[in-house]
Each structure stands twice: as C-alpha cells, then as structure tokens.
C-alpha cells in the first residue's frame, strides 16, 4: 500500500486497474487467472490499512471511486469485476492516426488522411468514422482482444 499512502498524503487520486484480457492474455486464460487481482481482492488489501467508502462518480466513469475519510480518494478501473462497456463513451486516437472505438475490438479507422482534405470534405468523413468507431463498442462486457494496450494509448 505504499503507493496509495503516498498519493493520499499528497492529495493525488490514484487509479488501480484490473488486468485486462488483451494481447497474449486474450487467449491464455491460465496466465490471465494467475496474474489477475479482482476488485474485491484489492479492496480487501486496502481495507487492511484504510477504512473507505464508495464515492460518487459520473455515469460514464470507467472507475469505481472510493473515499478514505479525511485523507482523499482512489479509484479502481474494474472492467472484469464491474463491466462498464454499456456506458463507455471513450474513443482512442493513436499517435499514428488510427481511431479505436473499443478496447475489445480489433477494428480501427484511419483518420490521418483527413488532415490533407479541405474542411468541407474532412468533417463529414470524420463524422462517418466516429459513428463507425462508436458502433464497434461492446454491448455488455469486455471480451478481450489481441490488440495491445500500448499501441492504442490505454
């Protein structure tokens, strides 16, 4: 808990993230399960050192937020334990110009070439690509994928 203590002492809101079934873990369930720490396990560990209460978060938040009374807040992005796909409003744009609508989908849409088009052509094309990317989102829960998080800027 040293990192959480460090953040609480300085007023930083730490985010923990559950391991996700991405990259090599998408197909290797044993490796995933050996490394996975669930939301409940994490809260159990934190509870040994701190009292905490669940705090409010926006409807489309990816993190479940908690308050350590008198000390600060922390959050857990727990997509395996508490899937948030249904309310996810995020899109990701890679540094190479690819738009990703969902971490669970290998679909991607290239927007880099729109930079060379005049505005009256680029905007409708961008709107179409945004709609396609939003259509890539999972309905209920993250299902994993071969995409590696570092490629899409998770």
How would you name each of these model-derived features?
Residues 1-6, 15-19, 24, 39, ...:
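N-terminal, helix-rich and Lys/Arg-enriched segments in bacterial and organellar proteins
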Residues 1-73:
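Radical SAM enzyme [4Fe-4S]-AdoMet core and its adjacent flexible, acidic
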Residues 50-104:
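C-terminal accessory regions of radical SAM enzymes
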